[in-house]
Amino acid sequence: MIALIQRVTRASVTVEDEVTGEIGPGLLVLLGVEKEDDEQKANRLCERVLGYRIFSDADGKMNLNVQQAGGSVLVVSQFTLAADTERGMRPSFSGGAAPDRAQALYEYFVGRCRQQAINTQTGRFAADMQVELVNDGPVTFWLQV
């Protein structure tokens, strides 16, 4: 399971001209689900995403996690993160989970974020989405479990 996380001052996702999720300061999480992923990996990745200390403390050091910083989370499914790009000029998506399994794990991950009392907004699984964000820093990390 892969999360590309970006520290943002604001972010939103729109599907068919409808805003489905919008946050102020916090994390934009682009989530990719791979074939071998399960709830245990989703738990571990959620723990890492929410615990990752990439927000500035009073001294300006990256020392706070999203909850300590009072931030929110916007989770957007992105199957392209599971692409194999090692050969050729076209990515292969054979490493991605089947759509039904990927959706179940995506929803599980979102639920785990919400259980941690984090304001969690979402896109719409498998939809054509437009994501807008202001990357703060820029600060972007690739987390994989």
Curated annotation (Swiss-Prot):
UniProt-listed InterPro entries: Daa-tRNA_deacyls_DTD, DTD-like_sf
Membrane-spanning intervals of the chain: none
Cystine bridges: none
GO cellular component: cytoplasm
Predominant subcellular localization, coarse grouping: cytoplasm
Subcellular location: Cytoplasm
Reaction equations catalysed: glycyl-tRNA(Ala) + H2O = tRNA(Ala) + glycine + H(+); a D-aminoacyl-tRNA + H2O = a tRNA + a D-alpha-amino acid + H(+)
One Pfam family here: Tyr_Deacylase
Comment field on protein domains: A Gly-cisPro motif from one monomer fits into the active site of the other monomer to allow specific chiral rejection of L-amino acids.
NCBIfam families given in the database record: D-aminoacyl-tRNA deacylase (TIGR00256)
Function, as annotated: An aminoacyl-tRNA editing enzyme that deacylates mischarged D-aminoacyl-tRNAs. Also deacylates mischarged glycyl-tRNA(Ala), protecting cells against glycine mischarging by AlaRS. Acts via tRNA-based rather than protein-based catalysis; rejects L-amino acids rather than detecting D-amino acids in the active site. By recycling D-aminoacyl-tRNA to D-amino acids and free tRNA molecules, this enzyme counteracts the toxicity associated with the formation of D-aminoacyl-tRNA entities in vivo and helps enforce protein L-homochirality.
Protein name: D-aminoacyl-tRNA deacylase
Originating organism: Salmonella arizonae (strain ATCC BAA-731 / CDC346-86 / RSK2980)
Chain's gene name: dtd
